[in-house]
Design a protein with these regions (language model features):
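ER/Golgi luminal nucleotide-sugar-dependent glycosyltransferases, focusing on the catalytic module
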Residues: 1-204
Length: 204
């Protein structure tokens, strides 16, 4: 999403980098982009989906995942969900993926948000420990599960940012973990950084 309805140079850099290591790249935009803007990334993507800005990033991912469908999803070794809220990459992505392939996990993300007993910010009793949604990766075992697709089929298209965080981002990790899937962050220090800094907006 871009409030100016443009694809920035930073976005192009990210998309180009992703295209070099992903077999297929679906670009979903919640912005009203002109064809001249979409042309900037067309050499790098398999498909472009232009939609209204409903549901924020989870609304966009929901539409793309349901469009792909269960049969297509299970063909992939991994599914990466990411947005443009953080610039990437600074270091080669291959190194990150290689290191995480050595870990015995079913899904992972760049950073993790620690458990907080006070969930008033998201209108919940607590905030569960969860992978931050700006970059997450799911393996074939997760993609083939009923719990993964059920989540995307059943989540409403929330209009409010807090509702998205409270009902989607902060809950999805726990839903998958409760189903027996194992997860880990790439940046292990993110368990402690936001607690030490007393800034729970890290890395933003």
């Amino acid at each position: 999403y871009d409030k100016k309805n443009v694809i920035s140079e930073e976005d192009i850099t990210s998309v180009c980098a992703y295209s070099k290591i992903f077999d297929a790249l679906v670009f979903v935009t919640n912005s009203d982009l002109k064809n001249s803007e979409l042309e900037k990334i067309k050499p790098y993507v398999s498909k472009c989906i232009c939609r209204e800005n409903k549901g924020l990033d989870f609304g966009a991912w929901k539409e793309a995942i349901l469009l792909l469908g269960r049969e297509k999803l299970t063909e992939y070794d991994e599914l990466v969900l990411c947005n443009n809220s953080c610039f990437a990459p600074i270091f080669p992505l291959e190194k990150m993926f290689y290191e995480m392939e050595q870990e015995n996990v079913d899904f992972w993300g760049n950073c993790i948000f620690p458990y907080l007993p006070d969930g008033s910010y998201i209108h919940k009793d607590c905030i569960p420990e969860h992978l931050q949604s700006y970059f997450t990766v799911y393996n074939k075992r997760v993609l083939s599960s009923n719990v993964f697709l059920k989540f995307w089929e059943e989540i409403p298209v929330y209009e409010n940012y807090i509702d998205v965080v409270g009902n989607c981002e902060s809950q999805f990790t726990k839903i998958l973990a409760d189903a027996g899937f194992i997860y880990s962050p790439y940046v292990k220090e993110s368990y402690y950084i936001c607690q030490y800094l007393q800034n729970y907006s890290v890395p933003y």
